[in-house]
């Protein structure tokens, strides 16, 4: 089921939250709305769900205009951050409740419950109550309840926020598997870049009620259009160096950093610039050598993370395979890989 938000706007009183948004989610696609708190991603999801009525524009499911339809008439499945399971009901009763409300015969409900329980792999938990379940098991029950009505659209609002790191990893892959097996169109709302990049076909990054870029995870990471997007994706995050164009090279005044810029960056001498350098692009193997001193070193299992204070003051972060010969206080002569550097103007627009 294709979803289209056509010039979608939403205000609360005199406060405009979203204005003239244009967004299309393809049939069978899983799309993430990613951004900081307050950017409008949940407001967008609630409008698709039917909880919020748009102030302007249209919402279409396929060719069907659902803008003015209530939630119950839209055939959507929703999983919220709080799973909202009924504590007095068993797992089977929780999952089957939407069908019971619709008046489906008990035998048919049981058949559907068994089918969906097999899909989300909780067939052995049918007689337990929510208090007897782990966080991951409760999440699976909530997902099963959302899917049992065979919705056209699945909406996920921060569904993994209450899980620990191990369970989040497990449920990321499980939700993605289920979405692919069912072929359902899904929208995920999250502020977690790892969730968005690992679970979704495309990501729409939002800022202050606007979509600033929409692309596949790989395209978004490797070709950010703004410094905001570049800074939002990546862990450890990208480092921004501020300088000016001097004789064709990016230069940080009072430092030894000079980096020739590609011919595609056509700006005037003296223009203020920002250089974005990801940690994986500052290593001993780069092509623009810069001296510095290690101020922080951390082992992260398979990798080491370093903070290096460059001559002249700026700090660069480096991530490398584990090595034991670098310590805090050491002088290093590493290099920036110019092929992985992003150049932005002083306002954060990619050049």
Q: For each of these PLM feature ranges, what is it?
A:
Residues 57-65:
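Conserved ABC transporter NBD signature motif
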Residues 49:
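Helix-to-loop junction immediately C-terminal to a conserved catalytic motif
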Residues 236-240, 247-351:
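Non-catalytic connector elements of ABC transporters
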Residues 34-36:
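The feature captures the beta-strand-to-loop junction immediately N-terminal to the Walker
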Residues 21-32:
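Pre-Walker A (P-loop) beta-loop-beta motif of ABC nucleotide-binding domains
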Residues 30, 71-228:
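ABC ATPase nucleotide-binding domains
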Residues 4, 24, 60, 244, ...:
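ABC ATPase nucleotide-binding domain
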């Amino acid at each position: 089921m294709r979803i289209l938000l056509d010039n979608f706007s939403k205000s609360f009183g005199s406060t405009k939250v979203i204005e003239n948004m244009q967004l299309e989610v393809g049939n069978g696609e899983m799309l993430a709305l990613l951004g900081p708190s307050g950017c409008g991603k949940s407001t967008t999801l609630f409008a698709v769900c039917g909880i919020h009525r748009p102030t302007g524009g249209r919402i279409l499911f396929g060719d069907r205009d659902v803008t003015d339809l209530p939630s119950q008439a839209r055939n959507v499945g929703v999983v919220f951050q709080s799973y909202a399971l009924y504590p007095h009901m068993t797992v089977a009763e929780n999952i089957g409740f939407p069908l019971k409300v619709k008046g489906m015969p008990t035998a048919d409900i049981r058949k559907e419950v068994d089918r969906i329980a097999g899909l989300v792999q909780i067939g052995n938990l049918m007689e337990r109550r929510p208090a007897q379940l782990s966080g991951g098991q409760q999440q699976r029950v909530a997902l099963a309840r959302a899917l049992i009505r065979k919705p056209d659209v699945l909406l996920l609002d921060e569904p993994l926020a209450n899980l620990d790191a191990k369970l989040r990893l497990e449920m990321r892959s499980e939700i993605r598997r289920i979405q692919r097996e069912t072929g359902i169109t899904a929208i995920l709302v999250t502020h977690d870049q790892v969730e968005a990049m690992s679970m979704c076909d495309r990501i729409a990054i939002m800022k202050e009620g606007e979509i600033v870029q929409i692309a596949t995870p790989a395209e978004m990471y490797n070709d950010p259009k703004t410094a905001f997007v570049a800074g939002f994706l990546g862990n450890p995050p990208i480092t921004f160096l501020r300088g000016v164009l001097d004789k064709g090279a990016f230069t940080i005044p009072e430092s030894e950093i000079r980096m020739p810029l590609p011919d595609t960056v056509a700006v005037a001498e003296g223009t203020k610039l920002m250089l974005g350098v990801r940690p994986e692009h500052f290593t001993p193997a780069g092509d623009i050598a810069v001296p510095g001193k290690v101020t922080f070193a951390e082992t992260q299992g398979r990798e080491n993370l370093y903070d290096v204070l460059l001559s002249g003051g700026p700090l660069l972060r480096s991530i490398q395979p584990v090595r034991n010969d670098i310590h805090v206080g050491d002088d290093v002569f590493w290099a920036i890989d110019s092929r992985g550097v992003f150049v932005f103007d002083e306002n954060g627009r990619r050049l």
